[in-house]
Amino acid sequence: MVDPNRVQLAKDIQMAQGAWPQARWWVRYQDPQLDRLIDFALARAPAIHVARARVEQAQAQLAAVKSGTRLQAIALGLVNRDHVSSNGFLGAFAHDEPALGLTGPSYSEGIVGAGARYDFDIWGERRSAVQAAVGMRNAQQAERAEVELVMTTNTAQLYFQIQTLLHQEMLLEEAQAIMETTVASHDARASRGLEAGPRVAEQRALLLQLEQQINLTHAQVRAQREILRALIGAGADELSELAIAPIRTSQLGMPATLSYDLLARRPDLQLMHWYVQSSISQVSAAKAAFYPSLDIKAFLGLDSLHLSDLLQHGSRQMNLVPGLTLPIFDGGRLNANLQRARAVNSDSIEEYNQAVLDAVREVAMAGVQLQALAQQEPMQVAKLHEVEVVADSAAAHYKRGLLSRADAATVRLPVITQEAELLTIHGNQIAQQIRLIQALGGGFVSSGT
């Protein structure tokens, strides 16, 4: 299996150090609407209910396997009406000779008592089966945590995609209002013969382009809402009140070291880990099946051929039957079971190793993207500041009557463009932060049980 000391990032991935994500990591964005949405998803999403049902199923299977390691006891009451064949093994009982105690050919046999059985697990076959079932139960618990992590991160991703689109739509509508003012101004100038028709047509084309972008953005919002609704199991009208909210980025650092912590904090890795542990126990159980098995059966009660004699002292019966079985010829069944268990174990180990490498890659990719976005953000803020200076100057000229209203408004368009670029960067930052949170396990910590 992969050495945990290899679970480290490359040295060129430099991020501020931070703590591991908390269990309710999404509260860092200070958005009550997001909090309610994720709580709704965890309570209502079908995928969550399926994962929880699988845990219950695995727990029941573990209880069933454990029961096989304990003393089995039963209480028995039986009435058996027999008609004995005179030509069979019990032919003597088919005769009616009271002097000999025979009242055949029909008898009403009665049995009352208690029986017990115990299997001695000398070679650990049943212990290994229990450990395999424990591994599967723990794997299902880790899978439930993984499903919950995927649900929360996907819900947050979709939510912030919708919020980004809503903010983009708001900027586009602001640009549309400016363009409508500009087109009206150009129309007025053209009607007085102060401006050529092609210039007016050009401005109208830009206005139509903005309207197309608004319609497209609005359609994207509706589509994302439908995807979100299906994901969390919401009804037809339960997301209609999803309102625009401020997009707040937050600082997210990288833990100082990964190593064993990442292996214990990723539910998908714990899922694979428990599959490996279960497969190891299955190999042990398959090996133990080659050895002799010892059990003992006991019965204590009353047995009589005649119901009228059942409660008499002479009807008492006790059986004690120790048993030893050794598989000799089984058609290759035990060897096949062992080979299958070993193959499953080998496959589980390789899948786990690959999952560990993939986990490190996911952390690294999110870290690289956040590094790049952290470098882009101050440059974009500087660009926005420069165009705002130009827009403020134009507004001042307009107030002094040195610039027309339409021209002053048009200068605002580059500001909107740069605000949209900064909005895209912030949306990408949040998306990569959520990917990093998911790659770091989203606050999951293995109990180690």
Describe the function of each predicted region.
Residues M1-A43, G91-D96, G110, V134, ...:
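Terminal intrinsically disordered/low-complexity segments used for targeting and assembly
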Residues M1-N154, L294-A298, Q317, I328-L338, ...:
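Short flexible linkers and secondary-structure junctions
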Residues I38, I111-G115, Y159, R204, ...:
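Membrane-embedded beta-strand positions in outer-membrane beta-barrel channels/transporters
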Residues H49-V50, K66, S106, F120-E148, ...:
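Sec/SRP-type N-terminal targeting helices
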Residues A142-L258, Q369, L373, K383, ...:
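Periplasmic alpha-helical coiled-coil/stalk elements that build and connect Gram-negative outer-membrane
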Residues L262, I296, L324, A341, ...:
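Hydrophobic, well-ordered secondary-structure elements that form the walls
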